[in-house]
Amino acid sequence: MTKTQIKAIALNASRQLNAVAKDVYNRDLVTTINHDQLKETSATLNDLYGVLDTNYQRSMKAGIDESMEYTELVKKRIDALAEYIRPTRLKAVHISPKQIVQMLDTEQQAMHHLSTLLDDITLGGKA
């Protein structure tokens, strides 16, 4: 897999987060749909981690380890956010859409940083 394809997976995850943030902001409501969207984003990040792991196995000199660790960190934070807005909790407690949008903004910044880390990896001897 090329570096461009790897970055495309990260970009897709970033776009998914952006869509969740826009949905919450526009509705001014956190829904179970948002929970499902975050689960999809988590799955995308899991795919990204798998691709990075495969390439890491091939070349220890590619500089992928930091990207892998950061991908795992972002995935865990998104999983935690999805757990925070789980459907059973949404029925029992009001969750502030503003707070969720702020949390999603933080994760979007983390995705931008991940993209920067992915820029620094080398695959196949090319940057």
Please tell me what each predicted stretch does.
Residues 2-127:
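Long, low-complexity or tandemly repetitive, helically biased scaffold regions used
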